[in-house]
Amino acid sequence: MAATKEAKQPKEPKKRTTRRKKDPNAPKRGLSAYMFFANENRDIVRSENPDVTFGQVGRILGERWKALTAEEKQPYESKAQADKKRYESEKELYNATRA
């Protein structure tokens, strides 16, 4: 019975790939509408619930974000659009100076 099964070959160790380091002068990515909402409301949630953990704060913020109507989300969406335009213009300038 042992003769019919092949002996296991030792596996070759996987090579670790190293990530390329980010350029510290590269422009920061634009924030999403949710991130603008979370940054604005995080302290409010913490003051209302002083005993919750970091993860629970995020969960509460997520629930509040889902409960917002499209009209209530609009100010955050417009901030996200403006930040996206800022990022794109900074990225174009950055790429032009790199090339």
Swiss-Prot record:
**Basic residues compositional bias: what residue ranges?**
13-22
Specify the protein name.
Answer: Non-histone chromosomal protein 6B
Give me the ranges of the annotated region Disordered.
1-31, 69-99
Localization of this protein: Nucleus; Chromosome
Which PROSITE patterns does this chain map to? HMG_BOX_2
- Coiled coil spans: none
Positions of transmembrane segments = none
Q: Which source organism?
A: Saccharomyces cerevisiae (strain ATCC 204508 / S288c)
Presence of keyword Iron-sulfur: no
Q: Which UniProt keywords apply?
A: Chromosome, DNA damage, DNA repair, DNA-binding, Nucleus, Transcription, Transcription regulation
Instruction: Give GO terms for biological process.
Output: chromatin remodeling; DNA repair; maintenance of transcriptional fidelity during transcription elongation by RNA polymerase III; RNA polymerase III preinitiation complex assembly; transcription by RNA polymerase II
User: Quick one: a GO cellular component term?
Assistant: chromosome
On subunit structure and binding partners, the annotation says: Weakly associates with the stable SPT16-POB3 heterodimer to form the FACT (yFACT or SNP) complex, which is associated with nucleosomes. Multiple molecules of NHP6 (NHP6A and/or NHP6B) are required to recruit the SPT16-POB3 heterodimer to DNA.
> Spans of biased composition, class Basic and acidic residues?
1-12, 69-93
User: What does the UniProt function comment say about this protein?
Assistant: DNA-binding protein that induces severe bending of DNA. Required for DNA-binding by the FACT complex, a general chromatin factor that acts to reorganize nucleosomes. The FACT complex is involved in multiple processes that require DNA as a template such as mRNA elongation, DNA replication and DNA repair. Also augments the fidelity of transcription by RNA polymerase III independently of any role in the FACT complex. Required for transcriptional initiation fidelity of some but not all tRNA genes. Seems to be functionally redundant with NHP6A.
* Family named by the database record: Belongs to the NHP6 family.
State any single GO MF term: DNA binding, bending
